[in-house]
Amino acid sequence: MRKRLIAALLIMLLCMGMSMTAYAVPQITPEEQPPAEATEEEAQAFKAAQLKKYYDMPVATNEIKGWPQGPGTYGEAAIIMEAGTGAILYGKNIDDQHYPASITKVLTALVALENGKMDDKVTFTHDCVSFLQPGDSSIGMKENDEITLEQALYATLLASANEAAYAVAENVGTNAGHDYQWFIDQMNARCKELGGTNSNFVNANGLHDENHYTSARDMALIGKELFKHPEFFKIVQTLQYEIPSSGTCQQHV
């Protein structure tokens, strides 16, 4: 029982990013944003009202007779899934489509673990780093840097490094005899194989794209599958990780 409860909690934590930060598809309408001429005080009040609206959204599992009542959340969607059985213990708008942002990298890790080896070489090409904009999550990898897939997954999952996620996808795809797009196709295929019906992924790092979206249920199904990969949980439970300097890479923490 204790292991099953821990598994359910881990599924909840994997999906927490969506419940707290995701934005729904279709796009936010003008009436859902503070007026352009609003003062800072008015904008804060507007945002507080939006959060209250999300908090007051009904929780579907609270409608089940005799089921424990779950709390509200300040997100538009949330889920707790029991990893052993797939039973949904808590659900709020679990099939609504949202922009997943960096929790995309959870699926990137799954596809990489299923198709690569931890000691595979990952080379950062021009495409891996050229898209980065100021403010994007990055550990500062440069073109032609080389690390292992294990190190790249640490960078992807601990630092949310966008260039590392791209490099993981590109190199795993290349090693399989294909390319970056093949990896993205595998992400979509695996999501569907796991029962996902409300997702479409167009990149490996979650940088915003109107055609890149998922749902709380789909992400929980992906998280459930990751219990077959203990190396994933070893990575995400690490507090700090250092990529040592080498002849092909500078030190990164």
Language model features with spans:
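Intrinsically disordered, low-complexity segments enriched in small/polar residues
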Residues: C15, I64, P68-G70, S245, ...
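Active-site-adjacent loops and short helices of periplasmic peptidoglycan-processing enzymes
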Residues: V25-R217, L221, L226-F227
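Sec-dependent N-terminal signal peptides of Gram-positive bacterial secreted proteins and lipoproteins
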Residues: R2-A24
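A general structural signal for well-ordered secondary-structure junctions
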Residues: C15, M118-D119, N162, T197, ...
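Generic structural motif recognizing short loop/turn segments at the entrances and edges of beta-strands
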Residues: L14, G135-S137, T197, G247-Q251
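Extracytoplasmic
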Residues: D218, G223-V253
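Intrinsically disordered, low-complexity sequence elements enriched in Ser/Thr/Gly/Pro
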Residues: M1-R2, K92
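Terminal recognition/anchoring or ligand-binding modules at protein termini
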Residues: L13, G177, K234
